[in-house]
């Protein structure tokens, strides 16, 4: 989990069907601050004697690179969202960054020459205090030189999908529901 804002964690409770289908707790990887907030917002998922139908989560606090499914190394990327530090993630040669407004130079080193760069882009113009806008993203793309970039966490202020796609560089695309990326 990148951070504790509602649009990033409130849906955890809706994952109950997956938890019940798998008959085991759902692992959640996050930093200590986010773990504390998840326990605060979903206390019923962590009590010893849960009521029938309550979800069950296992919190794994991230402190450096960790491994998913015993095969995928995940490197956390420290990013800034307005005035709070949140996480992005790098999986092999793909990075996922959402809700970023700044990336420190030391963290940019982890993001250079990726196969796939997934980054938030709220709108085309009018700077925002907590999210990148298109000119900032395109500047990052030039600096980091990923082979492909997908824009996420976009608003209606960016424009219509087909129109925006024609305005973007060849290696930058809008993400969309159902998009599958191989890396």
Task: Pin down the residues of each PLM region.
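Binuclear metal-dependent hydrolase catalytic cores
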Residues: 1-97, 106, 163-183
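Active-site flanking residues adjacent to catalytic metal/cofactor-binding acidic residues
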Residues: 2, 97-98, 119, 152
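Beta-strand/loop nucleic-acid-binding surfaces
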Residues: 101
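Binuclear metal-ion centers of metallo-dependent hydrolases, dominated by the metallo-beta-lactamase
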Residues: 104-183
């Amino acid at each position: 989990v990148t951070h504790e804002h509602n649009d990033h964690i409130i849906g955890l409770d809706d994952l109950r069907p997956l938890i019940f289908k798998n008959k085991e707790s759902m692992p959640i990887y996050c930093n200590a601050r986010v773990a504390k907030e998840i326990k605060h917002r979903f206390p019923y998922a962590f009590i010893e004697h849960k009521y029938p139908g309550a979800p069950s989560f296992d919190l794994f606090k991230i402190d450096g690179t960790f491994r998913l499914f015993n095969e995928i190394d995940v490197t956390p990327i420290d990013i800034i969202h307005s005035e709070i530090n949140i996480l992005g993630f790098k999986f092999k040669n793909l990075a996922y960054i959402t809700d970023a407004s700044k990336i420190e130079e030391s963290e940019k080193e982890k993001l250079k020459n990726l196969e796939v760069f997934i980054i938030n882009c709220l709108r085309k113009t009018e700077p925002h205090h907590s999210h990148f806008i298109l000119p900032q993203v395109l500047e990052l793309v030039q600096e980091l030189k990923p082979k492909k970039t997908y824009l996420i966490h976009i608003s209606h202020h960016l424009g219509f999908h087909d129109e925006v796609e024609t305005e973007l560089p060849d290696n930058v695309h809008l993400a969309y529901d159902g998009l599958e990326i191989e890396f």
